[in-house]
Amino acid sequence: MSSFEGQMAEYPTISIDRFDRENLRARAYFLSHCHKDHMKGLRAPTLKRRLECSLKVYLYCSPVTKELLLTSPKYRFWKKRIISIEIETPTQISLVDEASGEKEEIVVTLLPAGHCPGSVMFLFQGNNGTVLYTGDFRLAQGEAARMELLHSGGRIKDIQSVYLDTTFCDPRFYQIPSREECLSGILELVRSWITRSPYHVVWLNCKAAYGYEYLFTNLSEELGVQVHVNKLDMFRNMPEILHHLTTDRNTQIHACRHPKAEEYFQWSKLPCGITSRNRIPLHIISIKPSTMWFGERSRKTNVIVRTGESSYRACFSFHSSYSEIKDFLSYLCPVNAYPNVIPVGTTMDKVVEILKPLCRSSQSMEPKYKPLGKLKRARTVHRDSEEEDDYLFDDPLPIPLRHKVPYQETLHPEVFSMTVVSEKQPEKLRQTPGCCRAESMQSSRFTNFVDCEESNSESEEEVGIPASLQGDLGSVLHLQKADGDVPQWKVFFKRNDEITDERLENFPSSTEAGGSQSPKLFSDSDGESTHISSQNSSQSTHITEQGSQGWDSQSDTVLLSSQERNSGDITSLDKVDYRPTIKENIPASLMEQNVICPKHTYSDLKSRDQDVTVVPSTGEPTTLSSETHIPEEKSLLNLSTNADSQSSSDFEVPSTPEAELPKREHLQYLYEKLATGESIAVKKRKCSLSDI
């Protein structure tokens, strides 16, 4: 029995399935189906007077419900006030207050409820949100997902409230057999009985006037026997039902009902009192469709249960089971859910407790963040010294990290970049990655640190920057870019280096150029790059390697002492090709300045006491000495040689006197280390140009 009071909180100006008390002031009425518990007050005198005093109050229902309602003379006064709405057709309705003229627009959509002929659900859409009233319904699991009008844009509509049929919202009725299963069980029982003889009759003991039409029509169609009913007036406009029913009592299947006074014919078990014409007694069995009786059973039973000598119970339900209700509500996931029926043996609070977890209002509205999985994160390690690197990865590196210190843009006047470029080189070759580039470049990832192995003496820090260099340094420091392209493997063994000499006036320092550009045998994180802080001079020499792809490593830098620079004794290198050679005997005075050499160039060639000096590759004598004087307008030089011992072109040039050619076994040992990616130890020494 429905306990719905007729009004919804979202749209209180309309009344549904209730037509008395406060509902008399409604602007519109809605009827879901023609069962008496949903028609309270529909033919009351007070409602009749309301209709007589109003011109814009109507009753909305489905076309089948309208036909069923008007077949009864008691409801014919509604004939001019009933408006039928087609199922699954959104219809706009104006709710007008005749006293104040206030108007409200809503859209109503009728959805099939599966309860009885003409039963529908009402979907209301308006300014107060979307609300669904189910009335009495029976929908199988997953059937709501197939209703297109419950969806919008491929997803379920945002429903504010659902007024739900909770007749069997009780765990006792967790699973109710479907109508097809119930029909199959009843059909087999009826067939087995009526086929015995013409005197075997079945009585379907149905208490409701509407709702069993599904059972009647299917039995008649399968067995070819019409079902006897008391009257056919309500089905006269429904030929699909009328064809399977009859008022002739001479049939083997009866669904007739007892009179109101519950009078029984003593000579017959059938309500209609039919007997055989030749006085042969009839063999009658009764089948009572029921659901509540099966819900009270303590153990699972069959669809058909024999309760007496000639009586049976058949499980047949007009309402959704407990599992079907939960499936329907969890799919819609409304904000609120209100029960329309209090199940037998329970209370309203228990029903609300069951429905509440299925609504959005009980769920946390805060977004729940879930991890994407186990991700690699940087590990924080506290260091005592600021000079140590932070390990960004969990796994140790394949080789030990070299200690680095943060790079600071401090100008050191003693360090200059010397580049040798021949004047015979085309203009395009001068703009190689090792040369100055005019466009602004982004700093390399290696430019933030310099190796701790590089030492700056106290004398270098105390010497100031000449005034003549102040103007050039500011404009040059922004014209440099680190070229860290990864070299191809063939670069290690096939190279033709053309080393030339040319005076360039404005050349960027090696520090701003992005540090060492030596081949990366490991990863970018191996920490083996070397950065030299230097300054630019008006005259510098740069070694250009034609065809270099990522082998633009910075070569040895010969640092001039402050005494030699102040006295103006500068070595002049004019149009002469240079290449590195090995020299065993180096004066002690040569160790006063740093000679920074690439780590992959000359390690393990002779011994750790060997170093690199620059000698002419031709027969022209060129010396680096403090007695050599040049004009004072010449700027300081920063000698930078690209010692590439892996290039085969180094040994095709005629040897310089007093130069010692590398031995084959030394080169083989060096190449094997480079090929396997092993690090080459470099021992750096301080030297002075005056000792050369």
Swiss-Prot record:
Enzyme class, broadest EC rank: hydrolase
Chain intervals with Low complexity compositional bias: 530-543
Superkingdom per UniProt: Eukaryota
Cellular component GO terms, alphabetical: nonhomologous end joining complex; nucleus
GO MF terms held by the record: 5'-3' DNA exonuclease activity; damaged DNA binding; endonuclease activity
InterPro entries xref list: DRMBL, RibonucZ/Hydroxyglut_hydro
GO biological process: adaptive immune response; DNA recombination; double-strand break repair via nonhomologous end joining; interstrand cross-link repair; telomere maintenance
Stated role: Required for V(D)J recombination, the process by which exons encoding the antigen-binding domains of immunoglobulins and T-cell receptor proteins are assembled from individual V, (D), and J gene segments. V(D)J recombination is initiated by the lymphoid specific RAG endonuclease complex, which generates site specific DNA double strand breaks (DSBs). These DSBs present two types of DNA end structures: hairpin sealed coding ends and phosphorylated blunt signal ends.
Protein name: Protein artemis
Organism whose genome encodes this protein: Pongo abelii
